[in-house]
Amino acid sequence: MAIAPWSRLSADEMQLLRTTFWSAGGSRHGMAEQLGFSRSKANALIAGLVEQGMLAEAGLQPSSGGRRPERLQLNDGLGVLVGVDVGATSLDVAVLGLGLQVLAHVSEPAEVRDGPGVVLARVRVLIRQLLVQCGLDARKVLGIGVGVPGPVNFERGQLVNPPLMPAWDSFSIRDYLREDYAAPIFVDNDVNLMALGELWRLKRSLSNFLVIKVGTGIGCGIVCHGEVYRGAAGSAGDVGHICVDQDGPRCHCGNLGCVEVMAAGPAITRMAMEAAEGGESQAMADTLKAQGRIHAEDVGQASRAGDAAANAIVQRAGSLIGQMLASIVNFFNPSHVFIGGGITRIGPLFLAAVRQSVYQRSLALSTRHLEIQYTPLGAQAGLIGAGVLAMQESLRVRGVAP
């Protein structure tokens, strides 16, 4: 069992730590206002936390007139966080400071269908290597956040009937990693972590938004009233299996015409292969000849170079995802939709096709102020979100492993 440095703090002190984490460099006055504390109470609590080494002063904020306020942050000397982003075909692991700055990071190909034993054994090795690279040992890890591409029972840290990774069903990632680390370990769906990452970047300034990840699969992270919404069984946001064509191809879930089988990365690759082999695109035929296969990125590159067949593929994928998204926009009425995952490397034409489809199909009231854009955190959204999960939940459980 791990005991965090803050395990014996009062409720008010814990509130201050949480607020400091989410404000990412707020002032004493700002903390007092957010928490409804008097200035004298906030100053006394902050002074105590600085003295105990929990908080640190981090320079001055820009002046808005008058004396420049001092910024506060969690003391990086307390320890580090570990973020793990398990993708369907990739693995990212990072050691992060308490301000979510990346201290060390590694990314490599991985095949989630190899099963949890193979993938998580590699995760163990990479975490150890990164900690050594940072000159740290396991005792400095305050929390570990893990994202996986499937539904998760959040309380148990287990996957539940994950379509892309059936061998992981009911496997406890938490128990596996606990053999090496006493720090609390938290597991969530990968797109939920992307949503958490954006929520932290925004300092919770947006309360209702969506994050759509398009890669090997398609998923959605839902932020409702400033919190990630997971649903009754952890499967909220599994939008990849919304039907967009009843006569479409069969999905791996068993149904026909799911948007995932028609517009995700493998579908884009399949359409590109057909165009190359059918003589519709010389550019993609050349790529196929040179590489033996075509990646979604290659389609994007051909599209940006003006290849008509590539443009048609990108627009079709964007239009189908926009068709799916329009229903969700009508239902949920988000202020923003952020799109992430490997699809972002395809370029602006895909985003334009998504926007056009959503605005055409959604109610005017739902789209009047809607913004649709690529996720500003880019490829690191999942890792940052894993760090947010680790810190947020470690503070919630006071560092005691659940």
Predicted regions, residues:
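ATP-binding/phosphotransfer module of carbohydrate and carboxylate kinases, centering on a glycine-rich
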Residues: 1-60, 64-140, 181, 246-247, ...
